[in-house]
A protein has these predicted regions:
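Extracellular/periplasmic, surface-exposed regions of secreted and cell-surface proteins
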Residues: 1-24, 35-350, 355
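N-terminal, polar/charged subdomain of small-to-medium soluble alpha/beta proteins
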Residues: 30-31
Length: 358
């Protein structure tokens, strides 16, 4: 067996085109003959084109000592695309004329264009000694145009290990009834991003009735400081198997810290001319807990009949450690004596969504 180097590349193209023309003749309307909505024609078109390019390189070296195994993988992916749509609505057309371009009253006209791009690089390495001691390390770098300059990149490393205790020589006497015993420690980072584009620039749209004429009005407040929501997770897991895995259990203990949580529609003072931010990084939160999964494989069997059982037990506790005061003002409610409504509060150093009866 020799060293093995493998390359895999693929390109995916997604194309979407939609066209819709509608006509609402005068005969179907119950409005007056001179109403603005009769003899109405609408033309709508929507187009999008997106490319996803992925390149993967995998290297598996050959060791003379078969107790060792190693594999490393690198991957690059680029996603880019554009979309646009246009809608024109014309009313008051002469009988028999169905084209919006024929003229008439124009109660509505809109268009939209969007361009997006994201990419990531990822690297991972896997090492095992006698399949008893296993170590994994990875790193991922993400970039997206959903954030502004200086905030677009996120780095997400992770490390984990596994010790198959049951394979140790000194565990030989337990293998008649203990088929699996392993310990899995791990640490890693992940991130979240908003689902809207162009949040970091000022956007404008046409607005009518500005001193009797059409003008431009701002649509949003640009968000220059918006950044990745980051999650840091520690986990320790245990895998157990009994009697050739007829009974299996996995136990996980974890703690997770979320920094710069993203929240939609954060209310702000109307003196700015707007009522909310589309997105904001509003706070931090801690989660910790445990989870136990218990599975049986043909534990109860008689002839061709058998029964499998699955149980899950879990417990999670969270705590808000930092929160934007504007969010606290928006989410916190007051006691209403008439309907005996309990007081729901988001309060620092307390669980999220705590309910108070006073």
């Amino acid at each position: 067996t020799k060293h093995r180097l493998t390359y895999n590349g693929k390109v995916i193209m997604n194309v979407f085109n939609a066209y819709e023309d509608t006509y609402y003749p005068r005969e179907l309307s119950t409005d007056n003959w001179n109403a603005s909505g009769v003899s109405r024609a609408t033309s709508f078109s929507s187009k999008s084109l997106a490319f996803t390019t992925t390149h993967t390189l995998t290297f598996v070296p050959h060791f003379l000592n078969e107790d060792h195994s190693f594999m490393t993988m690198g991957r690059f992916q680029l996603v880019s695309g554009t979309s646009s749509d246009q809608k024109t609505e014309v009313a008051g057309l002469p009988n028999g004329v169905e084209a919006p371009s024929a003229g008439g009253i124009t109660p509505g006209m809109s268009s939209n264009f969007n361009r997006w791009r994201s990419l990531y690089y990822t690297f991972s390495a896997h090492y095992a000694f006698k399949e008893r001691y296993i170590f994994d390390v990875s790193a991922r770098v993400d970039g997206t145009t959903k954030f502004g300059p200086g905030k677009r990149w996120g780095v997400f490393p992770a490390v984990s290990g596994r010790w198959n205790v049951v394979d140790e020589p000194w565990m030989e006497g337990t293998r008649k009834w203990l088929s699996m015993l392993s310990i899995r420690p791990g640490w890693g980072m992940t991130g979240n991003q908003p689902n809207k584009d162009y949040l970091y620039v000022n956007q404008y749209s046409a607005a009518s009735n500005y001193f009797g004429a059409t003008g431009m009005a701002p649509n949003n407040l640009k968000l220059n400081t918006l950044q990745w929501e980051m999650k840091y997770t520690w986990n320790v897991g245990f895998d157990l198997g009994f009697w050739d895995d007829r009974i299996k259990a996995d136990i996980n203990l974890y703690t997770q810290t979320t920094k710069d949580m993203l929240m939609e529609n954060v209310r702000i003072s109307s003196i700015s001319g707007f009522t909310n931010y589309p997105y904001q990084n509003v706070g931090d939160m801690n989660n910790k807990g445990w989870e136990i999964n218990l599975n049986t494989n043909k534990l109860i069997q008689k002839g061709k009949f058998w029964m499998d059982l699955n149980f899950t037990f879990a417990n999670n506790k969270n705590e808000i450690t930092r929160m934007d005061p504007r969010v606290l003002e928006t989410l916190n409610s007051d006691w209403v004596a008439e309907n005996r409504k309990l007081l729901q509060r988001v309060q620092v150093d307390n669980p999220f969504g705590a309910i108070y009866g006073y």
